[in-house]
Amino acid sequence: MTLRICRALAPLALVALLATAPAWGEDTVLHAQRLLDVRSGRLIEDAVVVVADGHIRAAGARSSIAAPAGARWIELGDRTLLPGLFDMHVHLSIGGPHHHKFTETLFDGPVDAALNGSENARLTLMAGFTTVRSAGDNDFIDVALKKAIERGIAVGPRIVPAGYQISMTGGHGDNTGWPPGVFETTPEQGVADGPEKLLRAVRYQIKHGAEVIKMMVSGGIGDIDRPIDILQFSDEEMRTVVDEARRNHVKVMAHSHSLESTLHAVRAGVDSIEHGSQLDDEAVRLMKERGTYLVPTPQLFEGDAYADYPEFMRAKMLEVQRRAGASLDLAVHAGVKIAFGTDAGTAPHGQNATQFALLVNHGMTPLAAIRAATLAAADLLGVADRGALDPGLLADVVAVPGNPLADVHALEHVDFVMKGGEIFRQPK
């Protein structure tokens, strides 16, 4: 299936890729009015980033850096240079500008979803997000997209794929609400009960390219005839998933909309809580104690992403909205580690950056919100080769008009994107 999907993606974006790729070995100097050092929080005026062989050679004030002779200069004017951004919760195969209604997905096959995912990946990169973590895509479409992008037959961000989401029978991730025998699922498709079958489910995802495991520990907004706040999986089952993933050097993200499920998942050792729409003092204390990240997805909860969805989904969304904002406020105030994630696919692809302002509305500073999408996200992924504009790191660089520390909405207007030294977007 993965090979068929990659072949289907092959014609896409080739012309754009050839048009934007620089000559190999050519040194490039990016020059802008400002550069944000996300580690120190300092804005450096009249700044340059020197790029060679896909990596950052130097970054800082122009006066302190000797540009290589013969380098190509890119003049970006009144803009701020930043590291490429991360979105830690995306579903590339669903959603998008032409594919957003719940009922449309019922009639799509995996190739339809993969082609849709290719366009969503392009939109995501053009918005300045050079790395994304998949929160699950059926048929290993996220794995196929990762391969297609790495091979140069599609344009998009660096993808950390998850494969199928891990769910209990009847849980969020299973197909609920249908007659017996319709849309039945297997451990290979992520639906499993008990340690033995969960081992099979986790190992199968990793075998076929998953680099993170997504575990559903509560109900979800899209579940038919199932409550959202039910605890899914026993403690033993959660520990089985976490232990097996960790044995394979793979991290675990846990979808959770209930307080009870969050507490159990954190105690089981997951690396991040996704959504976390119901938290209390005990939950934030435990998350701080264990070093568990929160990926809060306020873009999903505070927008109108579900306006065209069935009534049962809108009702659950209203339930989540009533408590999600206060939970995020509590987490920010308590100092829980937060990484940036939008649930793009339910929230719109390519509009990921609108979430920065929402995080600021919940008490984060603009710098803290940017760090959530750079340094913190890189830490959660466990990668040390990106997330800042440091010499030796991958040349993933974006630029925005103006100063994002003064106006966080500037991040919604990325107009320069470089990934691995290749320029994919430039100001007109």
Where do the language-model regions lie?
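Bacterial N-terminal signal peptides
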Residues: L9-A21
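C-terminal cap of metal-dependent C-N hydrolases
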Residues: I44, A373-L375, P391-K428
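Metal-associated gating/positioning segment near the N- to mid-region
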Residues: R79-I153, T169-D174, E236, E260, ...
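Histidine/acidic-residue-rich catalytic or RNA/ligand-binding cores of hydrolases
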Residues: G96-H99, D223-D225, T262-A268, P298-F312, ...
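His/Asp/Glu-enriched, well-ordered alpha-helical/loop segment
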Residues: T105, R247-K251, F312, V320-N403
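Divalent metal-dependent hydrolysis catalytic cores, especially in the metallo-beta-lactamase
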Residues: N116-D142, V155-Q165, A210-D223, K251, ...
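Alpha-helix-loop-beta-strand connector modules within alpha/beta enzyme cores
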Residues: K147, R151-Q165, D229-A254, G291, ...
